């Protein structure tokens, strides 16, 4: 959370993320009740820690901007599983649908990684389908790059650079 007033900086000095820990809703509620002409912007929430019901509750706050960066990583459940992501593309789209019900022009941006090890053309096409269905304002597209010491770096089925570049 960032605010125009310095006092917002220390309002809640730790990460307040997961719903099971109370989530960010109490902080948004407190800030929303402050008089003044300002907006609250959330960024980079992960579908693994929120769900459609949680998003629906957050949308009742008037000062909350109708923009969210919600990282998908992939539209393929196969690739999401390989990435050890604890959500499916269907769960991701449930969140998007709630946002669109609230405001058809709700600004949603995302990250998509192409060329993750073992990604097939069908997996890639699932990501394209998710992009089309979600109607993102912007997609931050990245080619997978091997990082020493990560589980993915040691996986079989590394995708050749020319295929990653094409995708």
Language model feature labels by segment:
Residues 6, 32, 47, 88, ...:
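Auxiliary Fe-S-binding modules of radical SAM enzymes
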């Amino acid at each position: 959370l960032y605010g125009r007033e310095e006092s917002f900086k220390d309002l809640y000095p730790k990460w307040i993320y997961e719903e099971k820990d109370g989530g960010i809703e109490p902080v948004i509620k407190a800030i929303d009740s402050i008089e003044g002409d300002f907006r609250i912007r959330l960024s980079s929430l992960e579908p693994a820690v929120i769900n459609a019901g949680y998003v629906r509750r957050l949308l009742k706050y008037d000062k909350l901007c109708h923009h969210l960066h919600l990282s998908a990583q992939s539209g393929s459940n196969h690739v999401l599983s390989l990435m050890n992501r604890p959500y499916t593309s269907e769960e991701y789209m449930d969140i998007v649908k709630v946002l669109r019900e609230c405001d058809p022009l709700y600004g949603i941006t995302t990250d998509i990684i192409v060329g993750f090890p073992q990604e097939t053309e069908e997996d890639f096409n699932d990501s394209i389908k998710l992009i089309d269905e979600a109607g993102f304002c912007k997609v931050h597209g990245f080619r997978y790059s091997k990082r020493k010491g990560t589980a993915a770096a040691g996986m079989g089925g590394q995708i050749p650079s020319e295929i990653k570049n094409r995708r």
